[in-house]
Amino acid sequence: MVNEVIDINEAVRAYIAQIEGLRAEIGRLDATIATLRQSLATLKSLKTLGEGKTVLVPVGSIAQVEMKVEKMDKVVVSVGQNISAELEYEEALKYIEDEIKKLLTFRLVLEQAIAELYAKIEDLIAEAQQTSEEEKAEEEENEEKAE
């Protein structure tokens, strides 16, 4: 019984560690999704402003420079590690939206994995409770026989 409880505790701890790792990954995905959504909003805002409007562009964390919006028909988009591609404006928006969809799909997979781990934890707890109840019943039966 004691070894069985220890094994169950270790399994529960392992599942909880996996859940924490998956939650951390979801947090990173959420940050990336937020960044991509902000990029979409910024591109759309710049397009709405139109050519010739003045905007402030950040240069590092403490400086900004004034620039005029020129043509918004081309956008340079990161398509991989240190690789960028020049895309048409609408194509760039679609590319970013597709990336968001992929990340949301992956996020859903991680959430499902977390739900499965919680189900495994619940199964282990139920198993431990059942074992405990069976042992109590066995002890009571042995006590009755001893009397």
From Swiss-Prot:
Entries under InterPro entries matching the protein: PFD_alpha_archaea, Prefoldin, Prefoldin_subunit_alpha
Described purpose of this protein according to its UniProt entry: Molecular chaperone capable of stabilizing a range of proteins. Seems to fulfill an ATP-independent, HSP70-like function in archaeal de novo protein folding.
Q: Which PANTHER family match?
A: PREFOLDIN SUBUNIT 5, PREFOLDIN SUBUNIT ALPHA 2
Assigned protein family: Belongs to the prefoldin subunit alpha family.
Organism domain of life? Archaea
The protein, known as: Prefoldin subunit alpha 2
Keywords, comma-separated and alphabetical: Chaperone, Cytoplasm
**UniProt subunit comment:** Heterohexamer of two alpha and four beta subunits.
- GO molecular function annotations of the record: unfolded protein binding
> Where is it localised?
Cytoplasm
Q: One GO BP annotation here?
A: protein folding
Specify the species.
Answer: Methanocaldococcus jannaschii (strain ATCC 43067 / DSM 2661 / JAL-1 / JCM 10045 / NBRC 100440)
What's one GO-annotated cellular component? Answer: cytoplasm
